[in-house]
């Protein structure tokens, strides 16, 4: 759109593939054809892999909460950590804490990530690094490649989504340029495949989920914003 607004996308059928899923699916399709020509049983196995990839790379049908006070999950997966951490913010030096919610996406989850709030992209940049495992999250946060995406509401509240690379998540994708406005639940990007997503929100938000819970991107309410007048930024 000319004003930089991206409307929430609603899939018209089950197998609509996310834009960032097509490169993977195209390669899988080509491999399926080649293996079928070479040896039919291998082609049958590859076809099964193709169907599986189609499932996890699709645009899912999700019902996004309407309340403006709700922050939704940015990714499908299991919540592995909810922790208050020290943060700095050049726009508000008084902010010293943020709530960090860590979500681990598996190879059986939908890979498409979605905007947790309605707001404008104010930061989107990649930080080069390694692609180590997630067994030691402290090391992974320090050493692994990551992409940081900050969304800021009209009232100044901001949240940050961090895509964390890993052994299988080697492509961290978010094609939204700075200044683009996203609605809550709008496709945000993808960590191909099965990465970790960390969401940083104001420390005075109220979590609506627990460690171990499985969440759905764009649908599960994972936190509630503080009352107007007490809101703080977490970017």
Model-identified regions with their sequence ranges:
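Contiguous, well-folded functional domains in the mature portion of proteins
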Residues: 1-235
């Amino acid at each position: 759109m000319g004003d930089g607004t991206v409307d929430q996308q609603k899939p018209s059928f089950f197998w609509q593939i996310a834009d960032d899923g097509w490169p993977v699916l195209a390669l899988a399709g080509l491999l399926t054809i080649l293996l079928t020509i070479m040896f039919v049983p291998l082609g049958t196995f590859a076809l099964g892999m193709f169907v599986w990839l189609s499932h996890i790379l699709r645009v899912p049908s999700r019902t996004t909460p309407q309340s403006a006070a709700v922050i939704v999950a940015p990714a499908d997966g299991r919540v592995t950590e909810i922790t208050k951490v020290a943060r700095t913010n050049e726009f508000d030096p008084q902010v010293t804490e943020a709530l960090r919610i860590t979500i681990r996406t598996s190879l059986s989850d939908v890979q498409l990530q979605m905007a947790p709030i309605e707001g404008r992209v104010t930061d989107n940049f990649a930080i080069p690094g390694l692609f180590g495992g997630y067994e030691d999250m402290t090391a992974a946060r320090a050493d692994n490649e990551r992409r940081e995406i900050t969304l800021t509401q009209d009232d100044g509240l901001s949240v940050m989504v961090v895509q964390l690379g890993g052994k299988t998540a080697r492509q961290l994708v978010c094609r939204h340029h700075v200044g683009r406005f996203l609605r809550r639940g709008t496709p945000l990007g993808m960590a191909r495949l099965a990465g970790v997503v960390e969401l940083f929100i104001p420390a005075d938000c109220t979590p609506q989920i627990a460690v171990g819970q499985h969440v759905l991107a764009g649908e599960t309410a994972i936190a509630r914003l503080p009352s107007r007048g007490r809101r703080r930024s977490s970017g």
